[in-house]
Every structure is written in structure tokens, then in C-alpha cells.
Swiss-Prot record:
GO terms for cellular component: cytosol. It catalyses: dTMP + ATP = dTDP + ADP. It is an enzyme of class 2 (transferase). Belongs to the thymidylate kinase family. Its EC number is 2.7.4.9. This is Thymidylate kinase.
Length: 195
């Protein structure tokens, strides 16, 4: 089984992944994009943490390189091992669209399909959404921002809107959860969905 957690930075994906892992401590493989492979860790550093400045187009292709490597080394084995992944191609498309480069969504979908071995994976998607005010509060309390988060609140809210649209366009039946609520209530909904 393959489970993707989606949502912008600060919605609680990591918290919910840890809660799910603690309940089902069978051998789930927990992974993430970017950074779920050795190459991915290096790309994550360039994309999110380094002072290295790259163009938005180069950024898009580095995320795609990470996704292709992650698919080949990790995700394509989800028929043999249960995998929980923090982010998916949905994030890749949503963030790329928010960069205001006039990219075509169908081109982005096709590029991501190439990175994913030619098709969208059969998976369960959990989409955590948050209000602008709660996101502001959470990000302010966290304090430490990566290069993407530094683009600001409006940018992240635009990404969240893009994610909703991508799920509709691709007809992905994601479990959409209001991340403004109680952590334990959110966890209950996720647990029920994953069963």
C-alpha cells in the first residue's frame, strides 16, 4: 500500500505521519519528497537549505529528478512493502504552478508521469488543508524557514489552492482534512481512511 500525505508547509503532515506510524508499527517505510534517496538528500539540500541560487526552471527539474529517483528506488516497490510518503507529485505540480512562470498544467502532469515511470501511482492520498491565520501562527512559532517557505504566506496559500485543483483535474479521491482541528481528531479520520 502507498499512502501520500499532501499539504503545504505547516499543516501537520509530519505530526500525522508519526502518529500513524506509532499505531501501525508494522513495517511501514516512511519516506519523503524531496529527500527519500541518497540523491534526494543532496537535491533537498540544494533546493531548500543551501545559499545556492537556481532558476525556477532548474528548480522544477531538480524536483523532477528527485521524484524519478525516488520512484525507481522506493515507491515502485509499494506492492511489496507499505510506504508512507510525505509529499508527492501533487506538491511538485502545485508549487511549480505557484511560481508564476506560465507553465501549462498538462505539461507538468506529463513531466511528472515520466518521472513516475509513465503513470500516476495507485495510492491513497491524504490532503491536509489549513486556514491562512492558522498557517501564519504555526509558521511564526516554528521560526526557521527553508527557501520555499521564505516565499511567504500568500505563496503557500496559492500552492494549497493549486493542490485542490490538481486533485480535481486528476480525479484523485483524496481524503481532505481540515488541519485547523484537533490533532487527535485528525488522526482518527486518517486511521479510518487507511484501514
Amino acid at each position: 500500500m502507498l499512502i501520500f500525505f499532501e499539504g503545504i508547509d505547516g499543516v501537520g503532515k509530519s505530526t500525522q505521519i508519526e502518529l500513524l506510524k506509532s499505531v501501525y508499527n508494522k513495517n511501514y517505510l516512511i519516506t519523503k519528497e524531496p529527500g527519500g534517496t541518497l540523491l534526494g538528500e543532496k537535491l533537498r539540500e540544494i533546493l531548500l537549505e543551501s545559499d545556492f541560487k537556481i532558476s525556477k526552471t532548474a528548480e522544477l527539474f531538480l524536483f523532477l529528478a528527485d521524484r524519478a529517483e525516488h520512484f525507481e528506488k522506493v515507491l515502485k516497490f509499494s506492492d511489496k512493502k507499505d510506504i508512507i510518503c510525505d509529499r508527492s507529485f501533487v506538491s511538485g505540480i502545485a508549487y511549480a504552478l505557484a511560481n508564476e512562470q506560465n507553465l501549462d498544467i498538462n505539461d507538468l502532469i506529463n513531466l511528472n508521469k515520466i518521472a513516475l515511470g509513465g503513470k500516476i501511482p495507485n495510492a491513497k492520498f491524504i490532503f491536509l488543508k489549513i486556514s491562512k491565520d492558522n498557517l501564519r501562527f504555526r509558521l511564526e512559532n516554528r521560526g526557521n524557514f527553508d527557501k520555499i517557505e521564505e516565499r511567504g504566506l500568500e505563496y503557500l496559500m496559492k500552492v494549497q489552492k493549486n493542490m485542490s485543483e490538481i486533485f480535481k483535474i486528476l480525479k484523485i479521491d483524496a481524503l481532505e482534512i481540515d488541519a485547523n482541528g484537533d490533532i487527535n481528531e485528525i488522526h482518527k479520520k486518517i486511521k479510518e481512511f487507511v484501514k
